[in-house]
């Protein structure tokens, strides 16, 4: 179909419209927990989990030169007893058969394999990451402060903005893609009005196949936190775009 729309006001325990990968669990209390916790509900080391929406999304259509205009709206919160919790959560778009890469816990956020994490030609993933890990000897590809980043086929973000991680506070996020300007826009807000904006120009037809799946990924390494998804709505519609110039 030319358009797709779905909405989770919250997540039921028996939710059948999501595919869970790795340590992701529907824990009841209307929350989808992406990384593992112990029997007390406390976060643990070395965990990675993802969820995907069950239906595939038509991102673009070569035969008609149409590209999807999409928007993804979601909210999440993070909790940890540590002062430098890790690693983060990401909304991502990938080929329909996408699976958790081996060795992708920790700073690779469940999205990239260690060998090819910065090799753009080896990857097919578009992601918006909320990265909480920072240390002086931090991941070499990251700024040394918590940040929001837009990732295009690489764990090294195309663009980042400094972000304040707030313990247990819900962040509301809107990610939109406009095919006529080829721009991904991210707006993230806390309940008190603190706002973060980020945008990148990217032609999705050069990054991803025509059919994709959309979802979320999160991971922890040596440092840890819970990654709790509270709500998610998504809508996409194929639109006619101007013919690409043949350079």
UniProtKB/Swiss-Prot annotation:
Temperature-activity profile: Thermostable. Retains hemagglutinating activity after incubation at 50 degrees Celsius for 1 hour. At higher temperatures activity drops drastically and is lost at 80 degrees Celsius.
List of residues binding Ca(2+): 131, 133, 139, 142
Residues where Mn(2+) binds: 129, 131, 142, 147
Binding site for a carbohydrate: 87, 107, 138-139, 221-223
GO molecular function ontology, one term from the record: D-mannose binding
Entry keywords, A to Z: Calcium, Glycoprotein, Lectin, Manganese, Mannose-binding, Metal-binding
Keyword Glycoprotein: yes
Sugar attachment sites: 119
Superkingdom, natural source: Eukaryota
PROSITE patterns named among the record's database cross-references: LECTIN_LEGUME_ALPHA, LECTIN_LEGUME_BETA
pH behavior: Optimum pH is 7-8 for hemagglutinating activity. Activity drops rapidly at lower or higher pH.
PTM annotation, UniProt: Glycosylated.
A UniProt-annotated Pfam family: Lectin_legB
Recorded family membership: Belongs to the leguminous lectin family.
Assembly: Homodimer; non-covalently linked.
Task of the protein: Mannose-specific lectin. Also binds alpha-methyl-D-mannoside, D-glucose, N-acetyl-D-glucosamine and sucrose but not D-galactose, D-arabinose, D-fructose, D-xylose, lactose or glycoproteins fetiun, PSM and ovalbumin. Shows agglutinating activity towards rabbit erythrocytes.
Record's protein name: Mannose-specific lectin CML-2
Lineage: Eukaryota, Viridiplantae, Streptophyta, Embryophyta, Tracheophyta
